[in-house]
Amino acid sequence: MTIQASSGPSSALEAVLADLITVHHELLQLVREHRVAISRNDAAAIQELLSRQGMLGVRIAALEKARGEAIRAITGSARAGITEVLSKVEAGDRAGVAAKAEQLRSVLMEVQRQNGIVRAATQSLLGHID
């Protein structure tokens, strides 16, 4: 994690978003490996990948807490949406925060899509067991 003292709440938010992007890319890679392990019916690999995904979940939770704190520093509410956040950050910081938020949204959508594929593959495998 690169959470560190920064020149202001906008910089802190941008750093947290960058870390969230990195961790979610790591998660995406694990989900893809999970899909391959399912296709090979490799129980040991599946177990190991689930464990690693769980560890990333802990990192994501810590980053989400930091993200909420940065958003609270900007807007007064940890749950403010990106539109409100962007309306309250300084103009010079707006483009960077918006770009990171969009990158995070994009990787989250891909993680969700890949998780759907893994879920379907798991159900298919379980169907063969029944």
Question: What is the meaning of each model-derived region?
Answer:
Residues 1-36, 43, 47-130:
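C-terminal-biased regions
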